Swiss-Prot record:
GO cellular component: cytoplasm; ribose phosphate diphosphokinase complex
Lineage start: Archaea, Methanobacteriati, Methanobacteriota, Thermococci, Thermococcales
Entries under HAMAP family matching the protein: RibP_PPkinase_A
EC number: 2.7.6.1
Active-site feature positions: 185
Protein name: Ribose-phosphate pyrophosphokinase
Associated pathway: Metabolic intermediate biosynthesis; 5-phospho-alpha-D-ribose 1-diphosphate biosynthesis; 5-phospho-alpha-D-ribose 1-diphosphate from D-ribose 5-phosphate (route I): step 1/1
InterPro entries in alphabetical order: Pribosyltran_N (IPR029099), PRibTrfase_dom (IPR000836), PRTase-like (IPR029057), Rib-P_diPkinase (IPR005946), Rib-P_diPkinase_arc (IPR037514)
Keywords (A to Z) from UniProt: ATP-binding, Cytoplasm, Kinase, Magnesium, Metal-binding, Nucleotide biosynthesis, Nucleotide-binding, Transferase
Binding-site list for D-ribose 5-phosphate: 187, 211, 215-219
Amino acid sequence: MKVLFVIGSGAKHLEEEISRHGNLINVEIKKFPDGEKYVRVLERGKEAIVIQSTYHPQDENLIEALLLGDALSEAGFKKLKIVIPYLAYSRQDRVTKEGEPISVRAIMKMLGLYYDELYVFDIHNPKTLEHFPGIAKNIYPAEAIANYFKDKLGEGLILAPDKGALERAKRVAEVLGLEYSHFEKERISPTEVRMKPVDVDVNGKNVLIVDDIISTGGTMIKAANILRELGAKEIFVVATHGVFAEGAIERVSKAVNELAVTNTIPTEVSKISIVDYIVKLGEKE
């Protein structure tokens, strides 16, 4: 049977594609005159998957996710999953100054009040999923990224912008059967730090730089400039989440041959779809 999907306001850009694979539950979502959210589920069922990304406006989309969970429970749904393509507050995963919250922990606990299972895409720190009281899984779209770039890279290589992102580069490289490595920072003077790729020769090769989030794009631009100096042929940049600061798309695009992100957040360079991963969750029903 087809799974029942609920599309939140933060995932409207995925609605058309998802509707081809599953039944959409009819819900009414609007605002009261004072700005508060109104949610009403217009159908009945037993199990449902809510899809709600929590990019800007983050707080509004998070509240809506909670209201959808409560409304579905009131409507008689007994098992609820939520897919959050981009989870807000996920980078606030530790206390850096006394008196701060662990914001992502608070979000996880609230979601756990209504949802049995939580699925996120390429969360900043996968260990934070331990705060969710039910089943929680991190999905990394390595296959989708690899399939998009396979005909562009040839016998190229995959690079992570730092060691922390190496696992992402590894997973894409393994799908493509290509070499992978990462950049490291080398201090060349008391005031200057230089990035360099570790143990790989990029001269004459196409290179794909892989990361989880692009915001300002400064790291990617710096990495691309270094690769140019080292003789790289074509340079591609990809991230799961395009959290672009103003002007970032233009700046990064000028520095590389192509910039692409997935559609966890809708942007003008969201060229890689995550919908197949979401649909597979429904097929397990």
